[in-house]
Amino acid sequence: LFGYRFLFYSNDHTPMHVHVIKGGAKAKFNLFPVELVDNQGFKPTELKMIEAIIEENVETIAKHWNMFFNNNK
């Protein structure tokens, strides 16, 4: 989506969150509530866009989190 990759890592833990990567930049956002946890290289305008994308898709992302981690126990 807009060149951003949204992903989970197999060793991720709660709280429910998503990692975002584009080029050499990466960030981590918690899902409930959607909030920035870590940023390495994204500009503030990019972070606002990423946060808006996550807000719009938070239920879908959470569904995929639950499917991923419930299937990998």
Indicate residue ranges for each PLM-predicted region.
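Multi-pass alpha-helical transmembrane bundles in non-GPCR membrane proteins
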Residues: 1-3, 24-26, 47-52
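A short, structured beta-strand/loop element
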Residues: 6-43
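C-terminal structural segments of small proteins and small subunits
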Residues: 44-73
